[in-house]
Amino acid sequence: VKLETAIPPLLHQALQNLHIDALYSHQAKAIQKIREGKNVVMATPTASGKTLTYTLPVIESILETLESKALYIFPLKALEQDQLKALKEFTLPIKGQVKFPAAIYDGDTSSYRRRKIRESVPAILITNPDMLHLSLLPFHTQWEALFRNLRYVIIDELHTYKGIFGSHLAQVIRRMERICDFYGSRPQFVACSATIANPRSFAERLTGLPFEAIEESGAPRAGRNFLFLNPTGSPYTLAAKLFLDCLDNGFRTLAFTQARKITELLHTWILQDRPDLRGRVSSYRAGFLPEERREIEAKLVSGELLGVISTSALELGIDIGGLDVCILVGYPGTITATWQRGGRVGRTDRESLVALIAQPDALDQYFMRHPQDFFGRGFESAVVDPDNSVVVSRHLICASAEIPLRMEEEIIPLKNYGALLDQLVAEGELLRSASGKEWFSRRINPHRMVDIRSAGEGFTIFEEGTKRLIGKSNVPRVYNEGHPGAIYLHKADPYLVTQLDQGKKEVWVKQADVDYYTRALSEKETEILSVVRTQHLAQFTSCYGRLKVTERVRGFEKRRIFGQDLLSVHELEMPAHVFETMGLWIILPEGVSQRVKEEGLHFMGGIHAVEHASIALFPLFALCDRNDVGGICYPVHPQLEKPAIFIYDGYPGGVGLAEYGYGMLEELLKKTLSLIQDCPCLDGCPSCVHSPKCGSGNKPLDKRAAKFILEWLLGEKGPEKRGAEKIRKEPFPSSAAVLLPVDSEISDPRGDMAATRRPAWLKEEISRHRVLFLDIETQRSAEEVGGWQNKHLMRLAVAVIYDSLKGSFDVFKEDGVHDLIAKLKTAELIVGFNIADFDYNVLRGYSSFGFSTLKTFDILQQITSKLGYRLSLNHLAHKTLNMEKSANGLQSLQWFKEGKIGEVIAYCQKDVEITRDLFLFGLANGYLLFETKAGQRVRLPVEWDLSKIIKA
């Protein structure tokens, strides 16, 4: 389309040189609004030509007035380089006629170059928020030519300024506007964003200015194909194989991982498998030197590199040339980030492929089970709180050092911050003038004390001996990863923390060759300071308000890297991290706790699981990750005197996430219920209710109780309904076993036990042999004895045996353990579930007898050898027998400690019954039933023949 106002001849010449004869409709619309003096935010897809929409007006203004200046702000240095390159290419054909000086001013700019730039400020200055905060605003008198003539401020990748970074940038922008006002300029803002749900309101909250939004793109797009993969094995192994397959088929490929370590590991594995690709494949992540990053980017553009494995560092709009395939190793966390990363390939007229390889994580598995929701779901909203009191107070100090604060100011509304001003004066950070009308900073350069990318106090990490800088951390993260005894990972290398110096804000580490990692154990308390809003939803009440959160690291675990076995637990004395923030809380209705207990479920485990799962799904609605929000639950909160679940912003002062979550809480709980219902596990797993950051080691958790509680809260009937399941009739492929579909006639075995699962011939056959079905319960947990390798120290609480020859049960306590062992020696066959690895190892604490000599049939071993992975006894019982365990091991331990031996015996006997009936079902039918990750209920063929098993 054509612009309403003609383009100057020189610009027309520059466009023709780039073979641009016309503009897309969204470009023309945006340029027209910019020409009208309006602030504009563009939220159109990747590669839709957003850069051109601000390049034309900026250069047009320079042609009109040579003193005109523009400030370009990018979140990453690589984007700055990209922009400078694009500007040079655009202005090349008219370079001889008009000068368009542009320069980058960032941390990589030499001291000499910085001085030259300040002495002669270019028409276009390209920088980042950190440099604006630390180097431009504090020394604005040296940048008068920039701020007095500033016509445009360009903010690229607007959507990245969410959370605490966004709260800081909001204040940095207001400080910049204040300085511009001081010099008599009022710059116009142009922002570019990935597609988000709320570009206009987000831009307005970030800048405090009105905006016009351009959201509909007129640019053509090539076809994009999506492939969802949910591996039963390692997602990383599959990613490496797919990456190589793509390269071998001539497709240039980009793989995104979730962590630096995985990026480097994938790169290593690929080159180990294919050394011929060295120099044609590279990793890319933060932490690389600037010249290393630029070399990789240049090789991607030139085609020298066939593939790259990257963290999110390549997610943003760096020009990386034409690629064909994007492999997402794990769901990126948001729809916006997924499309942003997928948009890095197929950026010309070629079709592209985006392959999402799921990890055992709640969000990943949610979309694997609900792909229609992925494609039908709108983009998330970007959330920012410009009024975070902790952030505002720090920037008030910075602003007062730049230009004294005055109460009548409008850009920074001091009338709203009276309490903060009084507090800062009382703390000695601000000095009030004699007239009482102005405030000054006590410090000359307070900006150095403010890290705009974090909220807590900063700590520096050094290596012992060399005193080499290893990295940085902040409160509260430093208490979790920088405590004495912690293993700190840097570039995949392990370091042992030897000292945490609170006074100097230093952490000292030394290199360590260890086969374990550490995980902090913590405890939390939440105090309600004020209630801002209250609402009644479905069958519960929720509130939003100000909270005081107290977090304390009380110890840490050592876990083996391979297998994650618990090795040991260590206590710590660490200072509490206390902060005020904003949060929401759900007040559970009267009676729900009692009903959960009546169902034989664990109430605390249920609300704990609801808390974990709802936080895991929070990114479905807002741009964030699960580390941006925290949670805690109470069976009885001391202030409310009722059960409650809290979800709060994980940063002091709040960042707006809890407030946003409060507005969509019912929808969040519905999605949480769907996640828990659809996950095939029975007792909870990382795909539903486990949290990688749980300070109590994911204990207690009760998935069934969580489902019951959510159904109650949402107004559905409480107890789980049982009905015929709809089962797909096509087979589920597996390289480990042939999984046959279930016939509808026998898909849900019910009714008479003898008729359905124990035919007469089987009952008669097994009664002729002494087959003992064994299960034991212990007195101590693995944690209490220093890890699973110490099963022999767990001590016997109760053992139950079903004797097929007698047709009855025998119960043994610790004082009868030798009678138990003697009984086992009489058996023709002993059947159990995980008996070889667990039960026998517990009994080895009492006897040197060689239990491996006993004729044993371990059902779990049989299943693992077929599938390549484990299934729980409860899962098999539920899917095969329509039965469920009566409790769990944690509950049994608690009963024993409370002296409730009768409950322990009943629980143990129930497990023996389930084990027996699973074995008999397999003997009679030749299969067991289980449910796949995709929700398919299928057969697992078993070739069990009693006589052959006994004779083997």
Q: Where are the language model's segments positioned?
A:
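Conserved DEDDh/DEDDy metal-dependent 3′-5′ exonuclease domain
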Residues: 801-875
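Acidic two-metal-ion nuclease catalytic site recognized across multiple nuclease folds
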Residues: 736-752, 756, 916-952
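Conserved RNase H-like, two-metal-ion catalytic cores of nucleic-acid enzymes
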Residues: 748, 752-829
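Short cysteine clusters
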Residues: 679, 684-688
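Acidic, low-complexity intrinsically disordered tails
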Residues: 711-762, 952
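Extended Lys/Arg-rich polyanion-binding regions
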Residues: 351-354, 360-377, 395-406, 417, ...
